[in-house]
C-alpha cells in the first residue's frame, strides 16, 4: 500500500503557532532563538530584544563587499526585511505555504521568494552570501554545500547559524540538528575557507529555558485539565483515547512535558554554532 502523503507539514504548523504566540504575547515577529548576552536575563519580556540582538549579531558578521544575499528558510521574512532596510539586495527561500504568505505580505516587491526547497531553487542569479539561520538543520549537509556553491559568486560566502547534536546516543529530549562531528568532517570536502567560528550555545540556551517554563506553567496544566474535563464529561471516550493512543501520549509526555527540555540540557547535548565560510577562488 502506498504511503499516505501528508499535505500539511507539522514543522511549519509548529512555526506558525510559535509565530502567532510570539507576535501576540511577546510583540516579536522573529522565529529564531534569542541571544541572551550579559545583562539580559532569560525572561519572557526579554525575548524580543534578545531576538533582535541575534539578528544584529548576524548582520555584524556580514563581510564587507557583500551586496546580494539569499536567505534560506526566511520564516516570516522579518530578517530579510531588516536586511533590505540596511541596503542589501535579498532573495528568500521558503518551502512552506503558510510562512511564505506571511513573508510575501511583509516583503512585497522587496525580495523574490523561491517557494520551494533550497535544493530545488532554479535560477541563473548569483549571490555574494547564502544565509542559513536555523534552516541548515533541515537540509542534508552535502546537498546544502553543493547547491550553495552553484549559487554563489566567486569568492562568495556561506553563513550558518544553527544548533548541532553532540550526543551520539541521542539521549536528549530536544530534537533537531545535524550530528556535529559528521558535519565537521563533511565540510572538509568542499572548497571553502572557515573565516569565523563561534559557539553561542550559552547565549541561546535561555530560549530553551523560556520554552520549558511556558511548557511547565501553561501547557502541562492545560493538558491535565483537558483530560480531567474529558474524563468527567466523556469517561468512556476518554478511556478509549488513552488506550488507543497510549504510546503516542506517553511519547508526548516523555519528550515534551517532562520538564527536561532545559537550557542546561541544551548545552549538554547540543552545540549552537555560528560559521562563516568563504569560497576558495
Region spans (language model):
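A short acidic, Gly/Pro-enriched loop at the edge of an enzyme's catalytic core
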Residues: 120-130
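Conserved alpha-helix/loop element of class I SAM-dependent methyltransferases that forms part
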Residues: 48-65
Amino acid at each position: 500500500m502506498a504511503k499516505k502523503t501528508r499535505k500539511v507539514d507539522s514543522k511549519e504548523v509548529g512555526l506558525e503557532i510559535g509565530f502567532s504566540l510570539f507576535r501576540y504575547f511577546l510583540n516579536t515577529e522573529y522565529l529564531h532563538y534569542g541571544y541572551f548576552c550579559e545583562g539580559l536575563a532569560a525572561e519572557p519580556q526579554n525575548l524580543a530584544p534578545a531576538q533582535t540582538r541575534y539578528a544584529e549579531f548576524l548582520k555584524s558578521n556580514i563581510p564587507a563587499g557583500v551586496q546580494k544575499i539569499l536567505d534560506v528558510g526566511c520564516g516570516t521574512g522579518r530578517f530579510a526585511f531588516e536586511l533590505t532596510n540596511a541596503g542589501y539586495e535579498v532573495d528568500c527561500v521558503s518551502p512552506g505555504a503558510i510562512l511564505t504568505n506571511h513573508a510575501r505580505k511583509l516583503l512585497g516587491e522587496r525580495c523574490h521568494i523561491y517557494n520551494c526547497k533550497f535544493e530545488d531553487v532554479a535560477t541563473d542569479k548569483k549571490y555574494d552570501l547564502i544565509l542559513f539561520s536555523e534552516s541548515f538543520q533541515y537540509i542534508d549537509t552535502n546537498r546544502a554545500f553543493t547547491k550553495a556553491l552553484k549559487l554563489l559568486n566567486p569568492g562568495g560566502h556561506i553563513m550558518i547559524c544553527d544548533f548541532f547534536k553532540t550526543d551520539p546516543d541521542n539521549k536528549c529530549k530536544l530534537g533537531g540538528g545535524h550530528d556535529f562531528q559528521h558535519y565537521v568532517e563533511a565540510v572538509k570536502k568542499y572548497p571553502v575557507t572557515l573565516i569565523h567560528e563561534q559557539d553561542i550555545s550559552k547565549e541561546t540556551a535561555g530560549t530553551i529555558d523560556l520554552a520549558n517554563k511556558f511548557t511547565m506553567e501553561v501547557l502541562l496544566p492545560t493538558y491535565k485539565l483537558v483530560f480531567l474535563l474529558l474524563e468527567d464529561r466523556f469517561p468512556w471516550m476518554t478511556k478509549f483515547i488513552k488506550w488507543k493512543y497510549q504510546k503516542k501520549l506517553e511519547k508526548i509526555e516523555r519528550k515534551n512535558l517532562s520538564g527536561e527540555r532545559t537550557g542546561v540540557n541544551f548545552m549538554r547535548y547540543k552545540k549552537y554554532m555560528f560559521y562563516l565560510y568563504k569560497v576558495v577562488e
